[in-house]
Design a protein with these regions (language model features):
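C-terminal cap/loop subdomain of S1 sulfatases and analogous C-terminal strand-loop tails that border
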Residues: 53-59, 85, 97-100, 105-179, ...
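Beta-strand elements within well-structured catalytic alpha/beta cores of enzymes
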Residues: 18-25, 29, 46-51, 77-79, ...
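Solvent-exposed, polar/charged alpha-helical surfaces in well-ordered, non-transmembrane soluble domains
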Residues: 27-30, 34, 101, 105, ...
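Active-site rim elements
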Residues: 7-20, 64, 84-94, 106-111, ...
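Histidine-centered active-site microenvironments of extracellular/periplasmic hydrolases
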Residues: 34-88, 95, 148
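Short, surface-exposed helix-loop/turn micro-motifs enriched in polar/charged residues
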Residues: 39, 69, 91, 111-113, ...
Length: 222
C-alpha cells in the first residue's frame, strides 16, 4: 500500500467501527426505554443520556479528544424528567460536575458543602431557563501531555459565544501561545482572532477572568 492508500484504509476502518459503536449504543438505549415502558416505570424514572466528552472525526486535523475545540469540548446531555412536558432546550452552561448535585436534589438529599457543581433541577422545572445567578463561564484544563497522543497541555474559559485557550509547556520546549474564537462568527473555530484589534478588549477581559478562575480553583500549573 502507498501511504495515501494506507491512510484511506485506516480512515474507512475507523469510520466503520465508529458507526458500529453508535448503532450499538442506540440499540442499547432503546432496550432500556422499552423495558421501562413495559414495566410502567417511565413516570418514576429520571433518564439522563450523556458522555464524558465529544470526539474528533478529522476536524482541526485531529481524532480522539482532549483539545478544547467544540467537537470534543461539548458533550451530549438529554434529560427526561417525570412531570416535565419535554421537548425543551436549555442554553445554560452546564458541566458533568452538576450531575451529582442534580441526583441528590431529585432524591431530596442536601448537597454537601464541599461538593462542586450545581443542581440542574431548577432548569428542568422551568423549561430550560436557568436561575439568574447561574454561571457565565466554564473552565477547562488538560494537563496530561504524553507521547501517546501528543495533545499539548492547555487550559481556558468560554462563555456562550467566546472562547480563550492557553497552550503551555512547563518544560520550556514549546513557547506558550493563546487562541481566541468568536463562536457566533466562526462556529468551526478555524480563525484565531487573538491578535485582531476588534477583539482586544474581549481578550483582555477573558484573560483576567481566566486568571481569576485559576485562583478560585487553586490551579498551580498553567
Amino acid at each position: 500500500m502507498t501511504p495515501q492508500e494506507l491512510a484511506l484504509w485506516k480512515y474507512q476502518r475507523y469510520i466503520k467501527n465508529y458507526l458500529r459503536v453508535i448503532k450499538s449504543v442506540d440499540d442499547s438505549v432503546g432496550e432500556i426505554l422499552d423495558y421501562l415502558e413495559a414495566h410502567d416505570l417511565m413516570d418514576n424514572t429520571v433518564i439522563v443520556y450523556t458522555s464524558d466528552q465529544g470526539f474528533y472525526m478529522g476536524e482541526h486535523g485531529l481524532f480522539d479528544k482532549r483539545f478544547m475545540y467544540e467537537e470534543s469540548y461539548r458533550t451530549p446531555l438529554l434529560i427526561r424528567y417525570p412531570g416535565n412536558s419535554g421537548g425543551g432546550r436549555a442554553e445554560a452552561l452546564v458541566q458533568n460536575l452538576d450531575f451529582a448535585p442534580t441526583y441528590l436534589d431529585i432524591a431530596g438529599v442536601e448537597k454537601p458543602e464541599n461538593m462542586s457543581g450545581e443542581s440542574l433541577v431548577p432548569i428542568l422545572k422551568h423549561n430550560g431557563k436557568a436561575p439568574l445567578r447561574w454561571r457565565k463561564y466554564l473552565y477547562y484544563h488538560f494537563y496530561d501531555h504524553t507521547t501517546e497522543h501528543n495533545a499539548l497541555r492547555h487550559d481556558g474559559i468560554s462563555d456562550k459565544r467566546y472562547k480563550l485557550i492557553h497552550f503551555y509547556d512547563e518544560t520550556g520546549n514549546i513557547p506558550a501561545y493563546d487562541e481566541f474564537y468568536d463562536l457566533k462568527a466562526d462556529p468551526s473555530e478555524m480563525r484565531n482572532v487573538i491578535d485582531e484589534r476588534k477583539y482586544s478588549r474581549l481578550v483582555k477581559k477573558f484573560n483576567k477572568k481566566l486568571q481569576k478562575m485559576r485562583d478560585q480553583l487553586g490551579v498551580q500549573e498553567y
